[in-house]
């Protein structure tokens, strides 16, 4: 079973992603902020990471930079409400950039796509 | 010995050379909180006042795209008016502020007459337009025109408007940019324009151009800042709205898929309702912020307002297990402000303190008379304190450390305090909690001596 780490500060969204992605057949772990995500990443291995950018505490972009160092070959999807970070060169390092919307189809498709490579 | 000298000479010294008087009028005006229009008026004043260059009339054209457009025309309308004005302006000890005030008055009443005459005038600034007055800016030269009616290059409409045979065209240039043109004449004294008048007028032209250029740069900068702030606001609101939309959409889809049992359906609906309320709150807060319109500050009873806010907060304090301790000076004088807005400010500050403090802790509210003219209200929470980097951004719109905040609360408080001439200060130390202090201007006149 493929393992996905979701980094998302909104409680309801964490719940939604967890349920929806579990239903797709993934094993989902959620972290509510960057610190927690890094802690989990240091001791567990994942096949894919989905992260928001602006969160309380450490900035998501900073987190991605740090995760890049830890993740080795793990693909990253930036999943955010901000359109503008798409132009931030730090986010180019991510494998996909998904803008949050009322449909999870795009996010699910990107996950399927990246995990099948 | 060290002696402080004033930058601003209170009046003109008639003994001073007029070049110096002129320079001082123009440069001093840049110290004043004048508008661009007023400062240009000062330059026209310098050119026309007897203690300045002493032309009878000055007209100003401004560049507007590829057109030179008529703006202001300063000067008397008739020889009688000229005599009267010269009498007024030669009053001994008259300061330049009075002269500017006088000219502002002159311009306001002449707006339909003098300036009104040149307002419809506009000339194309194309390279091949070599008529007067455009030639001066096209060739970037000071042009002295004599026997204008015999000169075919003088624009007929312009000549009809100015109605004199001799005038001076001063281009307003900043580096290679054309900012406008000033045209000067001696319609009433009929004194021929002297070479030294031309020199001084040229100098004024350079100052005017430089000033217009700087003012336009400043305006551009203000606009850019406004656009940047607007962009920041749009980005923040987009984010604030997209998150609940994503949640609502996702949980609604689950409901529509029909696989949810009764408990899950109920849970989803509750989440959806919560997110809709959140969206509603965003709209409410934004609307509230945008329509901010405090009333004129009036004296009101701050302690009564504070007591009623504290009383209204009691049930919430009890429910959330926080204690509010208040110390309110019973002899507080009335303070200046909009009572409704101030009430909201106090309520917001106390709610903020609630949210920052852990359950079981105490919030301290005090109100005291600081001195004869200030009353201070302090609200202290029992939170972690605000880190210095966040403290610097406290009053920036859309800056928030709350997961669901809009970052408008403290800015609202600051705007209310600014509107009543008050102050807001923050004191915060890590682990020691944060104190917000509001300073209100008090009104002790009506207070009986104790």
Predicted features, each with a name:
Chain A
Residues 15-23:
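Charged docking surfaces used in two-component/phosphorelay signaling
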Residues 8:
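Conserved acidic carboxylate
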Residues 55:
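Receiver (REC) domain active-site loop signature in two-component systems and cognate sites
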Residues 33, 59-62:
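Acidic catalytic/metal-coordinating carboxylates
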Residues 39, 61-72:
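Short amphipathic alpha-helix used as the core "switch/output" element in two-component signaling
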Residues 77-79:
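Hydrophobic/aromatic residues positioned on beta-strands within the core alpha/beta folds
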Residues 52:
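Active-site residues of response regulator receiver
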Residues 30-48:
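Acidic, metal-coordinating helix/loop segments flanking the phosphotransfer/catalytic sites
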């Amino acid at each position: 079973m493929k393992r996905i780490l979701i980094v998302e500060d909104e409680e309801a969204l964490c719940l939604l992603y967890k349920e929806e992605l579990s239903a797709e057949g993934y094993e989902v772990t959620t972290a509510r902020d960057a610190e927690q995500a890094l802690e989990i990443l240091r001791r567990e291995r994942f096949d894919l990471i989905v992260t928001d950018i602006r969160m309380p505490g450490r900035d998501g972009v900073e987190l991605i930079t740090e995760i890049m160092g830890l993740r080795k070959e793990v693909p990253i999807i930036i999943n955010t409400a901000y359109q503008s970070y798409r132009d931030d060169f730090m986010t180019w390092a991510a494998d996909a950039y998904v803008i949050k919307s009322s449909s999870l189809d795009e996010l699910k498709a990107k996950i399927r796509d990246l995990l099948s490579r | 010995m060290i002696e402080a000298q004033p930058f601003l000479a209170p009046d003109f010294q008639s003994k001073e050379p007029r070049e110096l008087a002129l320079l001082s009028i123009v440069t001093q005006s840049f110290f004043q909180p004048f508008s661009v229009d007023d400062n240009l008026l000062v330059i026209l004043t310098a050119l026309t006042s007897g203690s300045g260059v002493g032309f009878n009339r000055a007209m100003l054209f401004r560049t507007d795209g590829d057109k030179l457009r008529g703006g202001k025309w300063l000067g008397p309308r008739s020889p009688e008016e000229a005599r009267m004005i010269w009498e007024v302006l030669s009053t001994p000890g008259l300061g330049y502020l009075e002269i500017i005030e006088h000219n502002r008055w002159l311009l306001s009443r002449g707006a339909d007459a003098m300036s009104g005459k040149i307002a419809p005038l506009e000339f194309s600034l194309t390279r091949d337009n070599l008529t007067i007055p455009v030639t001066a800016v096209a060739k970037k030269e000071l042009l002295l025109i004599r026997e204008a009616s015999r000169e075919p290059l003088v624009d007929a409409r312009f000549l009809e408007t100015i109605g004199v045979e001799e005038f001076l065209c001063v281009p307003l240039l900043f580096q290679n940019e054309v900012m406008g043109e000033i045209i000067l004449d001696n319609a009433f004294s009929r004194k021929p324009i002297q070479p030294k008048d031309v020199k001084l007028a040229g100098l004024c032209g350079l100052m005017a151009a430089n000033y217009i250029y700087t003012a336009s740069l400043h305006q551009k900068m203000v606009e850019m800042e406004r656009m940047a702030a607007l962009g920041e606001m749009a980005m923040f609101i987009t984010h604030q709205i997209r998150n609940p939309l994503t949640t609502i959409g996702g949980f609604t889809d689950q409901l529509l898929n029909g696989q949810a049992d009764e408990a899950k359906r109920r849970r989803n609906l509750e989440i959806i309702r919560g997110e809709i309320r959140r969206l509603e709150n965003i709209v409410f807060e934004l609307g509230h912020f945008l329509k901010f319109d405090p009333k004129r500050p009036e004296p009101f009873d701050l302690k009564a307002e504070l007591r009623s806010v504290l009383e209204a907060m009691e049930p919430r304090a009890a429910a959330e297990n926080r204690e509010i301790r208040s110390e309110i000076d019973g002899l507080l004088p009335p303070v200046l402000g909009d009572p409704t807005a101030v009430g909201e400010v106090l309520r917001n500050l106390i709610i903020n303190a609630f949210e920052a403090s852990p359950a079981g802790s105490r919030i301290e509210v005090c109100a005291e008379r600081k001195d004869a003219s200030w009353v201070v209200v302090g609200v202290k929470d029992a939170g972690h304190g605000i880190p210095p980097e966040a403290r610097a951004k406290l009053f920036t719109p859309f800056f928030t450390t709350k997961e669901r905040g809009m970052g408008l609360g403290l800015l609202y408080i600051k705007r209310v305090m600014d509107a009543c001439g008050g102050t807001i200060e923050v004191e915060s130390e890590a682990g020691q909690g944060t104190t917000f202090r509001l300073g209100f201007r008090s009104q002790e006149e009506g207070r009986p001596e104790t």
